[in-house]
Structure formats: structure tokens, C-alpha cells
Curated annotation (Swiss-Prot):
A Pfam family this chain is assigned to: DHquinase_I
Family: Belongs to the type-I 3-dehydroquinase family.
Enzyme Commission no: 4.2.1.10
Entry binding sites for 3-dehydroquinate: 47-49, 83, 214, 233, 237
Function: Involved in the third step of the chorismate pathway, which leads to the biosynthesis of aromatic amino acids. Catalyzes the cis-dehydration of 3-dehydroquinate (DHQ) and introduces the first double bond of the aromatic ring to yield 3-dehydroshikimate.
HAMAP family in alphabetical order: AroD
Gene name of the encoded protein: aroD
GO BP terms in the entry: 3,4-dihydroxybenzoate biosynthetic process; amino acid biosynthetic process; aromatic amino acid family biosynthetic process; chorismate biosynthetic process
Class of the enzyme per the UniProt entry, highest EC level: lyase
Record field: catalytic activity: 3-dehydroquinate = 3-dehydroshikimate + H2O
Name of the featured protein: 3-dehydroquinate dehydratase
Gene3D superfamilies: Aldolase class I
């Protein structure tokens, strides 16, 4: 039986896929403005994409913004993510700082989840995951391929590896070159969900071509999807309001 992931009042892996909406402001003013706009919205999780923040290399300033951000969103679960340039992010930082940043933020008690990239390496992952779990912070271990869609077996292998490394939520996002690539991602998702996963997983095929994968998680086995507030943080994201309507429609039809 698959275990569910409880984050505040949200149960990931139960019912329809949960909606996560990123905050991508470059400065404190913009970040707080986005937070105010989202605090009463129909969403499940807010992601702070801290790699967009102009002063991300100053941990003190990151914490100050985080404290204010939390005060506005109240009890909405918060995911903290620094996305590396290699995987589609905005800034380049050292692995040492990446590790320190995630540990320092996990220690604040202000975030509910953090995202750690699979290809940061086992040493970084072990250190961050173990620390976060001691602080009762859930961990997404993720991989983003902006160039291609790997073979089905490779997608499943990466998700299994994330699970082995202690991810509460394994996540993979891939780029389709054609319609068949979208089917490969969906087939890999379903195989992982039905055969190998003992916890919720998150998958998506990016770009407009892959948008169907962001909508049909309840059918194929992806437990969380990302929607945009105004600006997108990844190719293929659609408005979280439209996403909410479609997910509700599918959930009603399925059940």
C-alpha cells in the first residue's frame, strides 16, 4: 500500500492531484506582492522559486523574505526550491552553498517542503535529506531534462533512485520532441505508479505539447501538478485557475 504524504492540511497521494503555484519575484517587494495575491486562491501548495530572488546568495536576506512570505500565506504549505541553471533555473551557485542554503532554510521551521536535485549527487542529497527529515521537512528529489525525453526505462530508473535516496516525493520533468515522447512519459508514470512506487510521485512532460500530462495525473499516477499565477516558471504551465477547473472536471468524471 502506498503511503501518502501529509503536509499541513494537504494529503498528497489522495484524491485529485494537488496544485502547486510558484512565486518567482526577483525582489522582496515583488515576492510579497505575489504572496498576497495567492493567499486566498484555490491552490494547495505555494513554491518559492528562490533562484529568481536577486539576493539569493545572502542567506540572511533569504530568511528575512521567507519570514515575511510565511506571515502572508499563513497555513498554506510552502515548498522552497533553488533550481540550478543546468535544470532550467536562474542562477549558478556552488554545491556547498546549495547544501548550506537548503539546510539553513529547513532549520527555520518556516517551510514544509524543499526540492533537491537528483544530479547534485548522493553526498549532497544524503546530507540535505537527512537534515530536512530531522526538522520534519518533506523532500522532493527532482530531475528536469529540458533537452529530451529519456527512454521509459530511464525515467522509471531515475524515479526509483529518488525513492531509494529518501525522497518523500520523487519528481521528474522532461521535454517532448514529438507526441510519442508525451506517451513515453505517461507510460513511465503509470508503470512507476503501479509497480515500483511506494509513495506519491510527480511527473510532467513540458511545453505546450506536454500540457496534457499536467492535467491527467489522477489517471496515470502523478500526484501533484504545477500551475502559473501570472508568469510561468517552466514551459507548458497553464493558469492555476484553469488547471483547477480541469482537475475538478476529471476528478468528477473518474469518480
Amino acid at each position: 500500500m502506498k503511503r501518502k504524504v501529509q503536509v499541513k492540511n494537504i494529503t498528497i497521494g489522495e484524491g485529485r492531484p494537488k496544485i502547486c503555484v510558484p512565486i518567482i519575484g526577483k525582489n522582496k517587494k515583488d515576492i510579497i506582492k505575489e504572496a498576497k495575491e495567492l493567499k486566498d486562491a484555490c491552490l494547495d501548495i505555494i513554491e518559492w522559486r528562490v533562484d529568481f530572488f536577486e539576493n539569493v546568495e545572502n542567506i540572511k536576506e533569504v530568511k528575512e523574505v521567507l519570514y515575511e512570505l510565511r506571515s502572508y500565506i499563513h497555513d498554506i504549505p510552502l515548498l522552497f526550491t533553488f533550481r540550478s541553471v543546468v535544470e532550467g533555473g536562474e542562477k549558478l551557485i556552488s554545491r556547498d552553498y546549495y547544501t548550506t542554503l537548503n539546510k539553513e532554510i529547513s532549520n527555520t521551521g518556516l517551510v514544509d517542503l524543499i526540492d533537491v536535485e537528483l544530479f547534485m549527487g548522493d553526498e549532497v542529497i544524503d546530507e540535505v535529506v537527512n537534515f530536512a527529515h530531522k526538522k520534519e521537512v518533506k523532500v522532493i528529489i527532482s530531475n528536469h531534462d529540458f533537452n529530451k525525453t529519456p527512454k521509459k526505462e530511464e525515467i522509471v530508473s531515475r524515479l526509483c533512485r529518488m525513492q531509494e535516496l529518501g525522497a518523500d516525493l520523487p519528481k521528474i520533468a522532461v521535454m517532448p520532441q514529438n507526441e510519442k515522447d508525451v506517451l513515453v512519459l505517461l507510460e513511465a508514470t503509470n508503470e512507476m505508479f503501479k509497480i515500483y512506487a511506494d509513495r506519491p510521485i510527480i511527473t510532467m512532460s513540458m511545453s505546450g505539447m506536454g500540457v496534457i500530462s499536467r492535467l491527467c495525473g489522477e489517471i496515470f499516477g502523478s500526484a501533484l501538478t504545477f500551475g502559473a499565477a501570472k508568469s510561468v516558471s517552466a514551459p507548458g504551465q497553464i493558469s492555476f485557475k484553469e488547471l483547477n477547473s480541469v482537475l475538478n472536471l476529471l476528478h468528477k468524471s473518474i469518480n
